[in-house]
Amino acid sequence: EKQEELLVAMNGRAGRLTNEYLPGDERSFTIIAYPVPEIGNDFPKIFAEIVKINTLDYKQYERIQQTIIETLDTCQWVEIKGKDDNETDLIIHLHELEDVRKQTNFENCVADVNIPVGEVFTSPVLAGTGGILHVKKVYLNGLQFKDLKLVFDCGQVIDYSCANFETEEENRAYIEDNILHHHPKIPMGEFAIGTNTTAYVAAEKYGIADK
């Protein structure tokens, strides 16, 4: 436990030092993870799909996403409901705009910010933001989480569970070690809507989501 506290403190200090000497608003970078032949017999097709994903027409996505933004900028709240047996039920509180003609809550994120294109995002108002986020399967930093559930109140995680192990204690420890990193509370830093489904389709088609 003492080592975990030291690790959290070290990471926090390292982050502050990085931002002090390498300010985030003064640098930019792009990382593209191209597949290697070891990915399987479909390597040529998968490689072509990855190239396609990373060279989509960003102008088309920019127009689509601007329509989404203009609609969301008229809202104070966004309600997110899971489909079928997905238990997601979230309320996102948006910042109030004084003049929607001159102001916006959202970043129109295309290839000048991220490659591949495909999302609009904002930082929510923590007060009033809450509910449950349920993801049936997700990979974070190379680790799989099954039936991941995060419960939010006032925009912060107050409870959590997953179904990777047999006991609740093991599952909670897995989340604490690999998502929360032993912070007592983690705020919801971003609310985003993705528009690029090309990567998801390719991952499902070739069974490479875990690679």
Regions found by a protein language model. Name each.
Residues 1-129:
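Active-site bordering "gate/hinge" segments
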Residues 125-182:
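Long, well-ordered mid-to-C-terminal structural blocks that present hydrophobic/aromatic surfaces
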Residues 75-78, 145-147, 157, 188:
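A broad structural signal for short, well-ordered beta-strand segments within beta-sheet-rich domains
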Residues 30, 79, 91, 132-134, ...:
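Structured core elements
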Residues 96-98, 149-153, 207-209:
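Short, solvent-exposed amphipathic alpha-helical segments in soluble enzyme
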Residues 159-211:
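Dual-mode signal for accessory low-complexity, basic/Gly-rich regions
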Residues 36, 85, 97, 138-140, ...:
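Short, glycine-/Ser/Thr-/acidic-enriched flexible segments
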Residues 21, 34, 58-61, 139, ...:
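Sequence-level detector for tyrosine residue identity
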